[in-house]
Amino acid sequence: MSSPPRGEVAARLEPVVAEAVSAAGFDLEELDVQQAGRRRLVKVVVDAEEGVGLDEISEISRAVSKVLDAHEHVLAGSYTLEVTSPGVDRPLTRPRHWRRARYRLVRVRLADGSDLVVRVGEADDEGVVVLADGEIRTLAYRDVERAVVEVEFQQPPAEDLVRLERAADGAPERGGDRGDTEESR
């Protein structure tokens, strides 16, 4: 009896692995199954709002291992399990990725081919508020071709964070009078 193709194995395992990961309080970002000699390599990438530490990786690894053992017929043999968190260079492809990147610096390639380096603010299911070239603006996800977090070795400027917070709160960009009072809203 031949084993199912790699993509089919991952597709059959994804619902039960996702359930185990979710029950532990994490998001399944990726499930990949590859042949590695006589064994299969099952790579599980997980994330959470607050990030993932080594203790959490161990907990998830035990939970996923139990699920895989219960579904060993799908793997058709022995396997090696690798549980990891996404790297810093993971592309931001889902709204939750943007929410987790709040206040981080992100390199964005727009659909029109232009590139921006932005600081991320409030994100919802349609788009994200960013600080780009000193201006607060909103990017719709549909206009983003690729986005990756930039590594920073120092704290972001406090002024940038304040501006993004004010934008999230709906406050005027500058403290001046723009006719935008509580009564006029």
Curated annotation (Swiss-Prot):
Region of interest (Disordered), residue spans: 162-185
UniProt keyword Cytoplasm, yes or no = yes
Q: Which family does it belong to?
A: Belongs to the RimP family.
SUPFAM superfamilies noted in UniProt: YhbC-like, N-terminal domain (SSF75420)
InterPro entries from the UniProt entry = Ribosome_maturation_RimP (IPR003728), RimP_C (IPR028998), RimP_N (IPR028989), RimP_N_sf (IPR035956)
Q: What is this protein called?
A: Ribosome maturation factor RimP
Q: Does the keyword Cytoplasm apply?
A: yes
**Organism whose genome encodes this protein:** Saccharopolyspora erythraea (strain ATCC 11635 / DSM 40517 / JCM 4748 / NBRC 13426 / NCIMB 8594 / NRRL 2338)
